[in-house]
Amino acid sequence: MASSQRITLDQWKKKAAKVELNDTQKQEIKEAFDLFDIDGSGTIDLKELKIAMRALGFEPKKEEVKQLIAEIDKEGTGTICFEDFFAIMSVKMSEKDEKEEILKAFKLFDDDATGSISLNNIKRVAKELGENLTEDELQEMLDEADRDGDGEINEEEFLKMMKKTSLY
C-alpha cells in the first residue's frame, strides 16, 4: 500500500489519473473537503486533513498524515488544495475498494468462518472449480501464502498474496 512507502504528490496524481471513481465517490470527496473549506478559499487546513479523511471512512495513523503533509505542503502554507486532496482520496478509495473485493474472495474460501483458510478449504474450492491439483500442489499453494507458518492463511496473508498477483 502507498502508506507504507514514501510517495510524492506527483506520484499520487499519476496514480489518481488511473483511478475511476463513480459519481457518488467523487461527490463524497467533494463534500468532505467542502465541510472544512468554510471560507470557500479552495483550501483546507492540514490539521483538518485527518478529520476529512475520517469523514470518508478512513482511519489514518498519525504517521501517515505526517507523511502526507510532508509531501503535499512543500511550500509550508499549512493548507491543502482540493485538487491535491482529490488525488490522494481517489487513490485511497480505490485501494479500499480493492481490499474489500479481496476480502470477499477470502470469505469464499473461508466457508467455515474460522478467520483463516485451511488446506481443506483450498481442496474444496479447487474441486468446485474443477481444478485437478494434487494434495502436494495444494499444500504448496498454502505454504506459499502462509507467512507465519501456522498451516493456514489468515486475512492479512491473503491480502498480501493477492496484491502480488495481477488480479488486483
Swiss-Prot record:
Ca(2+) 1 binds at D37, D39, S41, T43, E48. Its main location: cytoplasm. GO terms for cellular component: centriole; ciliary basal body; cytoplasm. Interacts with G-protein beta-gamma dimers in a calcium-dependent manner. Belongs to the centrin family. It is found in: Cytoplasm, Cytoskeleton, Microtubule organizing center, Centrosome, Centriole; Cytoplasm. Ca(2+) 2 binds at D146, D148, D150, E152, E157. Pfam families: EF-hand_7. Phosphorylated on Thr-134 by casein kinase II (CK2) in a light-dependent manner. InterPro entries: CALM/Myosin/TropC-like (IPR050230), EF-hand-dom_pair (IPR011992), EF_Hand_1_Ca_BS (IPR018247), EF_hand_dom (IPR002048), RNA-helicase_DEAD-box_CS (IPR000629). One of its GO terms (molecular function) is calcium ion binding. This is Centrin-4. The fourth EF-hand domain has been proven to bind calcium. It comes from Mus musculus. Ca(2+)-binding protein that may be involved in basal body assembly or in a subsequent step of ciliogenesis. The modification Phosphothreonine is found at T134. Residues 24-59, 60-95, 97-132, 133-168 form the EF-hand domain. Keywords: Calcium, Cytoplasm, Cytoskeleton, Metal-binding, Phosphoprotein, Repeat. In brain, specifically expressed in ciliated cells. In retina, expression is localized to the connecting cilium and basal body of photoreceptors (at protein level). Highly expressed in brain, kidney, lung, retina and ovary, and weakly expressed in spleen. Not detected in testis, colon, stomach, thymus, skeletal muscle, heart, intestine or liver.
